[in-house]
Structure formats: C-alpha cells, structure tokens
A protein has these predicted regions:
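Redox-cofactor binding/interface segments in oxidoreductases and associated redox assembly factors
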Residues: 59-60, 79, 205-206, 234, ...
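C-terminal helix-to-coil terminal segments
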Residues: 2-4, 100-113, 127, 265-317
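Glycine-rich NAD(P)-binding loop of Rossmann-like domains
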Residues: 128-163
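Short acidic low-complexity segments
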Residues: 42-52, 65-68, 186-201
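Rossmann-like adenosine-cofactor binding region
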Residues: 181-271
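Phosphate/diphosphate ligand-binding glycine-rich loop within oxidoreductases
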Residues: 56-131
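Rossmann-fold dehydrogenase core element
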Residues: 93-105, 228-231, 247-262, 274-286
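N-terminal glycine-/charge-rich "phosphate-binding" loop or analogous flexible N-terminal tail
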Residues: 1-55
Length: 317
C-alpha cells in the first residue's frame, strides 16, 4: 500500500515519552510515511503552553481542553486509548470533528490485571506483601473468601466485562453486571438494584467510563452501604470515584481491601497510597508487548478511510 494525496496532511501527536510503551519513535514514523507519502508529523510540546498548532489530525492520549483550543483546522482526533474523557465535549463541535478511540486493543491486558487482583481477593497476598510467617499471614487469610463463595458486582459492561463473564461461566462465579443494556445471557442489574444490594457484595469491580452521570459515582453514600471488609477493584476512570470518600472509608475499615490502577502522581491519591489496605499499580493496566503493532494498525486503517472520506472505525461520536 502506497497512498499519495495532493494535500499535505499534518498529524499532531503526543506520543513522545521516556516510556517505550508510549513513544512513537522515528522508525515507526518512517514506516507510516512509506505507506502515506503526503503526511508529516509534529510532536506536541507540553512545555510550551501557548504554542498553536495547525494540524488536520491529532493522535495520542493527552489532548485536553487547553491543547484542543490551540489546534487550528483540526478535523479528526484519534485516541490511542479507550478513554476519551480528557476533553470537555461541550466545547467540541462533533459535527465538524471526528473522534475515534482504540477500544478493544488492550482489553486482554486490562482483563489480566483485573484477574490478578480478583484472584488475590481470595488470598490477600498483596495485603500481606512480604510476610514470610504463616502464623501472621493466617490472621489475614481467615478473613478471606474463596472466589466461588463471593458475590461479585461489576460496574459497567463492555469488552472487558465480557471477558469477565466468560471467566465467571467457566468457574461458576456469582457475578452481576451494573448496566443499562438488557442481555438475557448475563445477570444484569440496574442502578436501583445495585444500591439496594450493595451490602451483599464481597467484591465490586469498577469499569465505569467517565461521563457527567458517572462523575463521583462511587461516593460516600455508596461506600457507607458497603461491607466493612469489601474488596474494591478500581480500574475504571478515576473521575468516577470520590477519592476523598474512598480515603475515609479505607482508613476507617482496615479489613477492606482496595486494588487500584491509577496515576501515582495524582494529588488526590497522596492520602491513601501508603495505606496497608490498598495496592496501587502505576496506571499500567493497558500495557502489553504488541501495543504499537495494534495501535499503528488501527490508526493506518482509519487514516486510509479518513483520506478517502469514508466512515472511520471506532467512532465515538
């Protein structure tokens, strides 16, 4: 495939990082340019807060309202992740600007992390951390429940939840899904049913995407209804959690356990990241070895469609 177009297409990207996982290096760029001759790349300079950019396409994970306002003639934003909530869409004319994401490419990676956390709820090895004394560990273990004896609720139903459902079917787990979707093949509950039954759940897995309705969905009112020894697996968007209320809940209820995949530099996590009943991974849920192979593949497919003025895949608007 070698595509030539009359107009030069400018692609603005923020994929410049010390982490190889999120670094679009020269070799990757050259491979893309071999296939699409009339394109050029420019990296966002996050240190120049007033710089304006004239670009047709934005490709990355860090575009926010400030960067968006400094982009001139933008026609398409492609997120290199599933989450698209860094933009306030009240300020984006979705009739003029296409928005797509990279859903499904890292679903397996996130599922693997959740599975790691979920299995630990029945052993609490992460809570014991470096314990090498079985008598001391037994104090922790006696408060655990085997997965087969737990009542589990998953907040949200998408690609990752479908994988959890298949795992649940295989191991005969008691698992319900909070979702507005009606599906006879899964045990779906609505928000009212969830609120009425919170006290019955041993483990709650948060996979909620962020929107105005889900802002601080997990708040003091909900935490107060939970079991005092609840297991919380929080890999959804941080904005769906009232972190102050979470901090208060974990401090008060030492037998509760929280597993979180979040940005450790997040100021609101300062209070809780050293608690003994929380285990935080540094926002690596989406990490997997073939990220760039899949990311470039979906971007190139959409770039070809964009240049041909055809409908893009994974559109969110």
């Amino acid at each position: 495939m070698n595509l030539n177009f009359r107009k030069k297409i400018k692609i603005l990207t923020d994929f410049r990082s010390n982490l190889k996982m999120f670094n679009l290096d020269k070799n990757k760029i050259q491979e893309i340019k071999k296939k699409f001759k009339n394109i050029e790349f420019e990296f966002v300079d996050l240190n120049k807060m007033k710089k304006k950019y004239n670009a047709d396409i934005y490709w990355g994970t860090r575009i926010n309202d400030d960067i968006f306002k400094r982009c001139i003639n933008l026609k398409w934003i492609h997120f290199g992740s599933v989450g698209i909530d860094k933009l306030d869409y009240d300020n984006v004319d979705l009739k003029k600007i296409l928005v797509s994401n990279s859903k499904s490419i890292n679903s397996d990676a996130v599922f693997n992390l959740i599975l790691y956390f979920l299995i630990d709820t029945s052993r609490k090895i992460l809570k014991g951390k470096n314990l090498n004394n079985r008598i001391t560990y037994e104090k922790i273990y006696k408060k655990c429940k085997d997965l087969s004896d737990q009542k589990i609720c998953v907040l949200g139903y998408g690609n990752i939840s479908k994988k959890l459902q298949r795992f649940s079917d295989l191991y005969k787990l008691d698992i319900k899904f909070l979702s507005q979707r009606k599906n006879k093949k899964i045990d779906v509950i609505n928000e009212r049913e969830f609120l009425n039954n919170i006290k019955n759940y041993d483990t709650i897995i948060n996979l909620l995407k962020f929107n105005s309705k889900n802002n601080n969905f997990l708040n003091k009112k909900i935490f107060d209804k939970m079991k005092k020894n609840i297991n919380l697996i929080l890999v959804g968007r941080l904005k769906t959690i009232d972190l102050s209320s979470l901090s208060f809940f974990l401090k008060k209820n030492k037998n509760a356990m929280c597993y979180m995949d979040g940005i450790l530099e997040e100021p609101k996590l300062n209070k809780i990241k050293n608690y003994k009943n929380i285990f935080i991974t540094p926002h690596i849920g989406g990490y997997f070895k073939n990220y760039w192979i899949k990311q470039i593949s979906i971007f190139e497919v959409n770039l070809k469609l964009f240049l041909s003025k055809k409908k893009l895949k994974n559109l969110v608007n």
